[in-house]
């Protein structure tokens, strides 16, 4: 499972089940929030700095860091499924606290403060973040149970929550609300997610993950 719907590969990820790296908001009125330090280690992240307007770089960094950190909690390291679910549950509660203006536990404060600023400044839909967490938790449970995806509709539903929210969040940052644009973004993000899955089949199989529709595999005599 991955939030790499924008073809993200990283060489140094946030440590699984550990507190995220520290980061502080800008001090001056209207000053841009510095990029979260850990994000700068991801090899494809400079795309945000090179191609995006300067005012959007910090919000994009905050979204990326949240998604990457949650994804790492779900599938990096050697934690048990229960430990991963507990960590994501803790992050979910902290996210809700941040978005509702309540104090956030120290473990997640530096990760979520820039995200909260981005959400407030750009009116980002809260549900897109919880969709990501839902997808990560589902992936943990299915992997732990040795359960794959019954058919293409089942797999596409997973992409709807694991990949599409990132594209929609980026469109919201740019002020795009047109339904046709959102649907086009969904199609692109889902396609990139599927490509990511299928180019990593050998790696995922060794980790108990299988992102091919089981009905089609059975029809073609494919036994993972």
Each model region followed by its residue ranges:
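Acidic catalytic motifs of isoprenoid enzymes
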Residues: 2-20, 24-224
């Amino acid at each position: 499972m991955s939030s790499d719907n924008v073809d993200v590969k990283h060489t140094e990820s946030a440590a699984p089940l550990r507190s995220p790296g520290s980061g502080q908001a800008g001090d001056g009125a209207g000053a841009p929030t510095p990029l979260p330090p850990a994000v700068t280690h991801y090899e494809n992240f400079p795309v945000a700095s090179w191609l995006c307007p300067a005012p959007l770089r910090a919000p994009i960094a905050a979204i990326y860091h949240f998604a990457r950190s949650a994804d790492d909690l779900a599938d990096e390291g050697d934690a048990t499924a229960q430990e991963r679910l507990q960590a994501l549950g803790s992050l979910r509660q902290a996210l809700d606290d941040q978005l509702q203006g309540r104090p956030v536990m120290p473990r997640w404060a530096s990760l979520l403060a820039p995200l909260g600023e981005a959400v407030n400044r750009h009116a980002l839909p809260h549900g897109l973040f919880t969709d990501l967490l839902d997808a990560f938790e589902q992936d943990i449970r299915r992997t732990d149970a040795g359960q794959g995806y019954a058919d293409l509709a089942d797999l596409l539903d997973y992409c709807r929550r694991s990949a599409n929210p990132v594209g929609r969040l980026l469109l919201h940052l740019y002020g795009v609300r047109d339904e046709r644009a959102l649907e086009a973004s969904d199609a692109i993000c889902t396609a990139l997610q599927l490509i990511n899955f299928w180019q990593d089949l050998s790696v995922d199989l060794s980790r108990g993950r299988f992102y091919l529709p089981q009905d089609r595999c059975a029809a073609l005599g494919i036994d993972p």
